[in-house]
Amino acid sequence: MLITINIMRIRNLLLAVAVTTCGSISAQQWPYQNTNLSAHERAVDLTSRLTLKEKADLMWDESAAMPRLGIKPFSWWSEALHGLANQGNVTVFPEPIGMAASFNVPMVERVFTVASDETRAKWNEQYQNGIPTTRFHCLSVWTPNVNIFRDPRWGRGQETYGEDPYLTSLMGQAVVRGLQGPETAKHRKLLACAKHYAIHSGPEWSRHVANINDVSPRDLWETYMPAFKDLVQKAKVREVMCAYQRWDDEPCCGSPK
């Protein structure tokens, strides 16, 4: 499990290095620096060169620099649920639950294209001014939230696209396309993140202690999973955040299921 998680994280780190440095390494020394290789090949090579401590460091939302490997620091945590968060003068759009009520998928994609443009502009400004990448000042956004809003006690329900799996999937895909840019592009504009995988629907106060063990296989696959499947397979989302609670007695972040 650790190897799998690290390889997935390394793939995104390689992409992050590409979108932030774009040729800053003057000479290729190792296979992971060879952009002609597949992401998987590069990730496997880089993982093999990391120490245990370096692998552990990559599991945080703030990845430390690794000068010996030519890797700069990278922050994974920013938010753009309805526009870039915590960044001053940016456009604030309606909450996702409101956008979902429009049933207008192309509009949602345009909204998040604007959000990604503004995120890029903010990041370019800080980069040009020598401001290091930090939390909320980065190119990785933990958006969209494609959980199913079933419990009115959940104080984050407004982050979702409602209780319909099909609509949630369509809206989520539009968000990812708007944030990441065209799949045919050489590099992504941002790294989008599908969250929270899976069966995460509140209430918020019990998210770290809840053990969900009453979900039928049919409900799992017809209600909770479709949006995540579509975001990964169709929209090519670059990140997936696991849920906080347990499912069938196993923490979602460590479940073999």
Protein language model features and the residues they cover:
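Bacterial N-terminal signal peptides
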Residues: 14-22
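N-terminal compositionally biased, intrinsically disordered segments and leader/signal-like regions
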Residues: 5, 21-22, 36
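Bacterial N-terminal signal peptides that target proteins for export
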Residues: 3-14
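Glycoside hydrolase catalytic-domain context in secreted enzymes
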Residues: 27-257
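Extreme N-terminus of proteins, especially the signal/transit-peptide cleavage junction
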Residues: 8, 24-28
